[in-house]
């Protein structure tokens, strides 16, 4: 019986493609009589199978096509073939237009097909050709990646079955050259457009002869609009918003006839590329202000989101397992973390991390400068770091190593604290500075041009006492916090700025965080001691120590010279003990590019003074020794290699200091029984990231 076709105007939305019905296998009966209708069906099925095999589709797709789909695709293929035949004939009649060479006129068939397929796959959408009647003349095979419909499902189908009902009228207007289509009644021929014959005739002649579209009509033929299209991949609404961008061109070779039998001229059709409109989320719209999401740790691998990977042009394998020191650098007390990675072009891209202070576990876990910024300053950083010694910018050669004088200071019940006695013959850069001032470090003086020797004093620590969570008790008037040396940005060229201070109440102890923009350190610059986090250092005297002052054992080692110095912590979560013998003299190492403690001042000192001449080891952990040790000539250095060379140690015959590691059982730095509460150094100032694989030694005299 004949099937009733649903008119295109009343069609519902397109669903999934049809499946070929399974053929029932009936057992063959030898005595069965011949049936003429069955023979006719068998011949028809054989012809359809042969026609389906001629379609340019793989066998697995052809096996799923029903009879009507085979006929529809055959008609569509013949129409597309007729169109390209006419286009090739037009191009052959115009040899002077392009003037192709003999080699270009006959390209290899294999390379041409491969190039066309690759071009279609490189699009961010799919190619689409829609005739003036609303029939899908052609759709590329990549349509399945965006709408879920296979190419065989949409070829020679009504486009309005895939367009949202509210967007159908707008799509119909886009198919007309003047965006004013005539009213078409279904079942009746379209009315003759007598007013448009002259315009369409001129456009047709111009396109046939290759002279190009007249400039006065080019604006009418360009199309760019948005419609909602039926999508099987979207489970929320079933529609995907897509942008159609292209032009109206004549569709040749269709050979359509009027009801009177006259040949109709080619009509304008839409040749476009349909691409999905990606509406960015709120997080993606703030890409420029949120480039980095990371938790930097000195002993863990760097973590970065997809935005950082896109910025640095690096894949997941290049970032996996890479330690944090190679991905970012902390610019001392400023706390500005700069993610620094090498791009594909061989240049270094620097991405600043901007985030507020995150207080986790009672302490600042990540303190970042919201105003910090860093660009591609590779050449300028090399110029600044090359002048890292001396005021005049000339590189100075470090002098010989000399012992530093130590005197016994004030003792308490928890141990002895050594004091460094300055000498009158000290260099100007190592003389005691006024209270609250910053000592001029050699690396800072050479960094800035025309840097004066005298620096503006920083605010006194007493100015911030009101911002702490607990008052400072049992602190002498002559005890001050050692000021910190900063590394300002390149915009500060003439003098060290006066840093602003911000205090955070952490675990009841006051601490300072200098919010000052700093110079990001390049990965290859190994310029200072490693002062890391989360490990306590203790110094204990031997039980048979005779030269110890009052027989007291200090409970901890302090960095700096005053009684209110700051404890040093390390990230390996292991305690490090040193047990100096009475025969040995412990010397302080010069903090070449690290945090320098202030010289003691305002307190009477005893003992002879010696000239202070700093030395510059590659990596040194500078520990202050105990009091009461006799002054003697410096012994041979105890060289403990870094990671990977822990078994290599060089010890003199009379060397007595012993280094031990113990599991983490952090001692209380301050208890209620202690006489004073030490001011803790901010973690941002101690977290100076240095690659552990770099060659260098830890010098413990």
From Swiss-Prot:
Gene3D superfamilies cross-referenced by the UniProt entry: Helix-loop-helix DNA-binding domain, PAS domain
Biological processes, Gene Ontology terms: regulation of transcription by RNA polymerase II; xenobiotic metabolic process
Domain named bHLH: residues: 28-81
Main location (coarse class): cytoplasm
Subcellular location: Cytoplasm; Nucleus
Assigned keywords, A-Z: Cytoplasm, DNA-binding, Isopeptide bond, Nucleus, Transcription, Transcription regulation, Ubl conjugation
Tissue localization of expression: Highly expressed in testis, lung, ovary, spleen and pancreas. Highly expressed in mononuclear cells (MNCs) from umbilical cord blood. Isoform 3 is highly expressed in lung, kidney, spleen and thymus. Down-regulated malignant tissue from different anatomical origins, including colon, breast, lung, stomach, cervix, and ovary.
Residues covered by region (Disordered): 1-40, 366-434, 448-483
S-S pairs: none
Cross-linked sites for Glycyl lysine isopeptide (Lys-Gly) (interchain with G-Cter in SUMO2): 577, 660
Gene Ontology MF: a single term: nuclear receptor activity
InterPro entries given in the database record: AHR/AHRR (IPR039091), AHRR_bHLH (IPR039092), bHLH_dom (IPR011598), HLH_DNA-bd_sf (IPR036638), PAS (IPR000014), PAS-like_dom_sf (IPR035965), PAS_fold (IPR013767)
Induction record: By 3-methylcholanthrene (3-MC) in MNCs from adults. By the heterodimer AHR/ARNT.
SMART domains given in the database record: HLH, PAS
Residue numbers spanned by region Needed for transcriptional repression: 551-701
Compositionally biased spans, kind Basic and acidic residues: 374-383, 471-480
Recorded GO CC terms: aryl hydrocarbon receptor complex; chromatin; cytoplasm; nucleoplasm; nucleus
Pfam families reported for this sequence: HLH, PAS
Domain PAS: 112-182
Quaternary organization: Interacts with ANKRA2, HDAC4 and HDAC5. Interacts with ARNT; forms a heterodimer with ARNT.
Role of this protein: Mediates dioxin toxicity and is involved in regulation of cell growth and differentiation. Represses the transcription activity of AHR by competing with this transcription factor for heterodimer formation with the ARNT and subsequently binding to the xenobiotic response element (XRE) sequence present in the promoter regulatory region of variety of genes. Represses CYP1A1 by binding the XRE sequence and recruiting ANKRA2, HDAC4 and/or HDAC5. Autoregulates its expression by associating with its own XRE site.
PANTHER family tied to this protein: ARYL HYDROCARBON RECEPTOR, ARYL HYDROCARBON RECEPTOR REPRESSOR
The name this protein goes by in its record: Aryl hydrocarbon receptor repressor
């Amino acid at each position: 019986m004949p099937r009733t076709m649903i008119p295109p105007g009343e069609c519902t939305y397109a669903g999934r493609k049809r499946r070929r019905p399974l053929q029932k296998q009936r057992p063959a009966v030898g005595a069965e009589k011949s049936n003429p209708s069955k023979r006719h069906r068998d011949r028809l099925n054989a012809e359809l199978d042969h026609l389906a095999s001629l379609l340019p589709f793989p066998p697995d797709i052809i096996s799923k096509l029903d009879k009507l789909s085979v006929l529809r695709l055959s008609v569509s293929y013949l129409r597309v073939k007729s169109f390209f035949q006419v286009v090739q004939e037009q191009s052959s009649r115009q040899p002077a237009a392009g003037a192709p060479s003999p080699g270009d006129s006959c390209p290899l068939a294999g390379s041409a097909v491969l190039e066309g397929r690759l071009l279609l796959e490189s699009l961010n959408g799919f190619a689409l050709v829609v005739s003036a009647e609303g029939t899908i003349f052609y759709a590329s095979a990549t349509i399945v990646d965006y709408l879920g419909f296979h190419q065989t499902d949409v070829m020679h189908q009504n486009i309005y079955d895939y367009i949202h009902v509210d967007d159908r009228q707008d799509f119909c207007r886009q198919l007309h050259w003047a965006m004013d289509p005539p009213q078409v009644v279904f079942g009746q021929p379209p009315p003759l457009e007598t007013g448009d014959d002259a315009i369409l005739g001129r456009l047709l002649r111009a396109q046939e002869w290759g002279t190009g579209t007249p400039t006065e009509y080019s604006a009418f033929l360009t199309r760019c609009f948005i419609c909602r299209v039926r999508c099987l991949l979207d489970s929320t609404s079933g529609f995907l918003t897509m942008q159609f961008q292209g032009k109206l061109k004549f569709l040749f070779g269709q050979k359509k006839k009027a009801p009177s039998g006259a040949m109709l001229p080619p009509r304008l059709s839409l040749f476009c590329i349909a691409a999905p409109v990606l509406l960015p989320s709120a997080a993606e719209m703030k890409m420029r202000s949120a480039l980095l999401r990371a938790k930097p740790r000195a002993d863990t691998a760097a973590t970065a989101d997809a935005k950082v990977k896109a910025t640095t042009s690096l894949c997941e394998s290049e970032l996996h397992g890479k330690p944090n020191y190679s991905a970012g650098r902390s610019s001392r007390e400023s706390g500005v973390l700069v993610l620094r990675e090498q791009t594909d072009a061989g240049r270094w891209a620097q991405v600043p991390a901007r985030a507020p202070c995150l207080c986790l576990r009672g302490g600042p876990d990540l303190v970042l400068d919201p105003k910090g910024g860093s660009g591609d300053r590779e050449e300028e950083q090399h110029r600044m770091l090359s002048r890292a010694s001396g005021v005049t910018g000339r590189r100075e050669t470090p002098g010989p190593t000399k012992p530093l004088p130590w005197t016994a200071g004030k003792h308490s019940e928890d141990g002895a604290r050594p004091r460094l006695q300055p000498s009158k013959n000290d260099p100007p850069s190592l003389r005691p500075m006024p209270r609250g001032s910053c000592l001029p470090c050699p690396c800072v003086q050479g960094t800035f041009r025309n840097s004066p020797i005298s620096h503006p004093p920083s605010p006194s620590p007493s100015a911030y006492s009101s911002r702490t969570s607990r008052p400072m008790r049992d602190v002498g008037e002559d005890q001050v916090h050692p000021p910190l040396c900063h590394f300002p940005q390149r915009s500060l060229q003439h003098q060290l700025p006066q840093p602003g201070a911000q205090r955070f109440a952490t675990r009841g102890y006051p601490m300072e965080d200098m919010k000052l923009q700093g110079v990001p350190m390049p990965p290859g610059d190994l310029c200072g001691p490693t002062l890391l986090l989360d490990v306590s250092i203790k110094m204990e005297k031997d039980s048979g120590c005779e030269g110890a002052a009052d027989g007291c054992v200090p409970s901890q080692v302090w960095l700096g010279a005053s009684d209110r110095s700051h404890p040093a912590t390390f990230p390996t979560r292991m305690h490090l003990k040193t047990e100096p013998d009475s025969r040995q003299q412990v010397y302080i190492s010069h903090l070449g590019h690290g945090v320098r403690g202030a010289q003691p001042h305002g307190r009477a000192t005893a003992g002879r003074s010696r000239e202070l001449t700093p030395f510059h080891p590659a990596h040194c952990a500078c520990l202050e020794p105990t009091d009461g040790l006799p002054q003697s000539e410096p012994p041979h250095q105890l060289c403990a290699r870094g990671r990977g060379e822990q078994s290599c140690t060089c010890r003199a015959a009379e060397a007595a200091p012993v280094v031990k590691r113990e599991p983490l059982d952090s001692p209380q730095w301050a208890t209620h029984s202690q006489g004073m509460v030490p001011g803790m150094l901010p973690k941002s100032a101690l977290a100076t990231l240095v690659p552990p694989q770099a060659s260098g030694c830890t010098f413990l005299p």
